Amino acid sequence: MSAGEFAVRPVGPADIPGLCALLNEIIRIGGTTAMETPMTIESFLDTFFRSQIQISFMVAEASGGDLLGFQVLAAHEKLPEDWADIATFARVGSQTSGVGSALFAETLTQARRFELAAINATIRADNAGGLAYYDRMGFVTYKVDEKVPLKSGHRVDRISKGYRVISD
């Protein structure tokens, strides 16, 4: 499937069950998200809508209606006011090329609209795909939190990468 066979658009209420299922599959497999507990629709809404100030929430949808991935850009209390935190999730096993790039292009448009200085992405060090994705998008590592404990007791580094939205 090519970029012409999917569209990126803002998330709507009807998307929530499908996005929750997509995220739960990623959580179930493990190793690519800091989230470790599957979500109910209620906890999905709490996490992505009720507990943060959203700037952008985009979904990639195949021409047949399948949800291929989503990207959230939100304010974060641990970041400067003119920064936002990004999270990206793609359907497991999807062979669709260009979803991540298309999502980021739309998210970046919103970041510029809100005059953000930078975007932060925090990725588990064992998430090679996530690290490579943010590198491809132009993010640069600026901080490493070492040996962050998981629920299992296993420890993993978390890498923070930044993307400058506006230039000096």
Feature locations, PLM:
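Conserved catalytic-core motifs of GNAT/GCN5-like acyltransferases
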Residues: 118-124, 135, 140-157
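Helix-loop element at the rim of GNAT/NAT acetyltransferase active sites that forms part
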Residues: 21-38
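Terminal substrate-recognition subdomain of acyl/acetyltransferases
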Residues: 2, 89, 152-168
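Conserved acetyl-CoA-binding loop-helix of GNAT-fold acetyltransferases
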Residues: 96-111, 132-136
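A short beta-loop-alpha structural element at the N-terminal edge
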Residues: 7-19
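Acetyl-CoA-dependent GNAT
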Residues: 10-13, 36-93, 104-106, 110, ...
